[in-house]
Swiss-Prot record:
The keyword Lyase applies. It comes from Staphylococcus aureus (strain COL). It catalyses: 2-succinylbenzoyl-CoA + H(+) = 1,4-dihydroxy-2-naphthoyl-CoA + H2O. The keyword Transcription regulation does not apply. One of its GO terms (biological process) is menaquinone biosynthetic process. This is 1,4-dihydroxy-2-naphthoyl-CoA synthase. One of its GO terms (cellular component) is cytosol. It is an enzyme of class 4 (lyase).
Amino acid sequence: MTNRQWETLREYDEIKYEFYEGIAKVTINRPEVRNAFTPKTVAEMIDAFSRARDDQNVSVIVLTGEGDLAFCSGGDQKKRGHGGYVGEDQIPRLNVLDLQRLIRIIPKPVIAMVKGYAVGGGNVLNVVCDLTIAADNAIFGQTGPKVGSFDAGYGSGYLARIVGHKKAREIWYLCRQYNAQEALDMGLVNTVVPLEKVEDETVQWCKEIMKHSPTALRFLKAAMNADTDGLAGLQQMAGDATLLYYTTDEAKEGRDAFKEKRDPDFDQFPKFP
């Protein structure tokens, strides 16, 4: 594996947020519990992803887990209380749902770099990422029905779009675990590489993506998400279109005419069939 010098962009307690040549990397840093997340972990990830979204130097975002044994094993069951996962404020919550939506709407590609276990809510995080590079030691699966939990959102509905309804029901009803090759065969990941090469491969994919039009990638992500995200997905795509429209001379003519208190001259712009 190439020895890269990742730059720390911000210090957190339960995650790492680093940068390397246009790539932001968010790492769940709780290896002692297989990178299970708490409300604080999720809040920190939301903050880091929001910063990556706004950072003009960031083109692609990588989500991973600390160490080689786990990407993420889902919510920390020791923090689960009455009504949700209890944080330092003693309020039960499921803020991981906010994180899932954020990953979906960020107008930049998000790649899951999976080493070891991606189970439970960890597999759902894998599911909502745009692409997945899996190490050959990766293990995938859902655990909810075993521990009195479930994900009736992206973790089931969108999972079924990816692997098919029959396979998704198998994953949830049986709570089995699947190795990296099995995950590749069902379309849950994009590629499988040796553990020692997983970061090299992920960075290579990032660099290939970064050669392409960020506006085109933004619209492609929004278009593919709109199919499964309903009106929220359409809203995101419409917002992306509006931002692009604002950069055109046609939009600027309307704005300038209003500011200059005159009628806009829209006849000068083409009306393509």
